[in-house]
């Protein structure tokens, strides 16, 4: 059967096989080995995601020195790819422990397949946190520019399931007029569905929806560049959770369950992601914090020994800087505000004391 064929009613997919090419079994040393579509697609996904993330990091000017953000993304990519694959494999092993109970060492045979995206994302997030903690960079800013490349990579990588004839959806009856279907060869069918030939191509559904989420994230990136740090991350978490829940409802092949239960692990992961993501977005964009500027002026006047009118003027200037440069680092905002708080206003305060007061003022303006 052709890899895909179009008819009057829609599109039918049929995998040409899992190998791009394969050495004949009689070939010395490499007989039977070859390049798999899944591996090739994963490599393409990583490369495309890396190039996009580098471009977004530079466009966002995450580092003052040109090219520095791109270099940092390359270092981050190594951390994330390694930790992501390890996490995805560990998650698979834990949710398919019955396959490895008798031979635990086979868990290291990753070339046999078996990775789950939720584990990769969790491990990657941990690696990103540790890297940012070690280097002192703003992790949310880098996480935000990573998310479009991540979901685009997922859209590409999901086609690996097509070539492997795995992770397919519920069977489609012969008389069904549903326009999309994938042919699954007999040896790849679940035993309880062996009498069916065609199934829902959920790999295709998710790939398309991932592209929709990618377009949404990119639209947010260019249309609303001043959104709070972390907005793209939690939008991705919410969006992908919404995509994954119906995907799992249809899925009948290669299903991962919580150990000792009949509950799909992806249901739990998606439900947690959905609740956490929505909760974080609500928390980040809760009722706008409008600080009491008069109260802050009184506080600053007392702490700095200023007249109330002078303190009020300084608070107003700091508030204007806060509104205009809300995405700037705290240190950058302090630098912008310091010319408005010269030593002549408070000769009894040192430069360090004035900087500390301005820093505290900005924190109070943010409601912290």
Language-model segments: which ranges?
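Long, low-complexity, intrinsically disordered cytosolic termini of multi-pass membrane proteins
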Residues: 291-368
């Amino acid at each position: 059967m052709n890899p895909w064929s179009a008819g009057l009613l829609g599109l039918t997919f049929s995998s040409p096989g899992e190998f791009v090419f394969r050495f004949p079994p009689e070939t010395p040393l490499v007989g039977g080995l070859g390049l798999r579509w899944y591996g090739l697609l994963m490599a393409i996904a990583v490369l495309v995601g890396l190039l996009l993330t580098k471009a977004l990091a530079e466009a966002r000017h995450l580092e003052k020195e040109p090219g520095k953000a791109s270099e940092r993304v390359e270092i981050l990519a190594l951390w994330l790819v390694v930790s992501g694959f390890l996490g995805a494999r560990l998650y698979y092993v834990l949710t398919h422990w019955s396959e490895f109970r008798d031979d635990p060492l086979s868990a290291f045979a990753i070339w046999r397949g078996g990775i789950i995206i939720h584990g990769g994302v969790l491990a990657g997030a941990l690696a990103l946190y540790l890297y940012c903690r070690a280097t002192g960079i703003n992790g949310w800013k880098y996480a935000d520019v990573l998310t479009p490349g991540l979901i685009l990579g997922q859209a590409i990588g999901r086609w690996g399931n097509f070539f492997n004839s795995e992770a397919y959806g519920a069977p489609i009856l012969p008389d069904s007029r549903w326009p999309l279907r994938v042919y699954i060869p007999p040896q790849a069918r679940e035993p309880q569905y062996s009498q069916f030939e065609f199934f829902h191509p959920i790999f295709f559904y998710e790939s398309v929806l991932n592209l929709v989420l990618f377009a949404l994230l990119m639209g947010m990136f260019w249309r609303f560049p001043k959104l709070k740090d972390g907005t793209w991350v939690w939008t991705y978490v919410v969006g992908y959770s919404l995509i994954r829940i119906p995907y799992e409802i249809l899925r009948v092949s290669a299903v991962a369950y919580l150990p000792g239960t009949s509950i799909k692990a992806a249901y739990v992961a998606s439900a947690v992601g959905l609740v956490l993501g929505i909760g974080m977005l609500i928390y980040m964009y809760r009722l706008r914090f409008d600080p009491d500027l008069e109260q802050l002026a009184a506080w600053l006047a007392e702490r700095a020994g200023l007249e109330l009118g002078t303190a009020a003027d300084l608070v107003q200037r700091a508030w204007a800087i806060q509104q205009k440069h809300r995405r700037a680092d705290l240190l950058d905002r302090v630098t912008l505000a310091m010319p408005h708080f010269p030593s002549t206003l408070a000769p009894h305060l040192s430069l360090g004391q004035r900087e500390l007061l301005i820093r505290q003022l900005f924190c109070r303006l943010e409601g912290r």
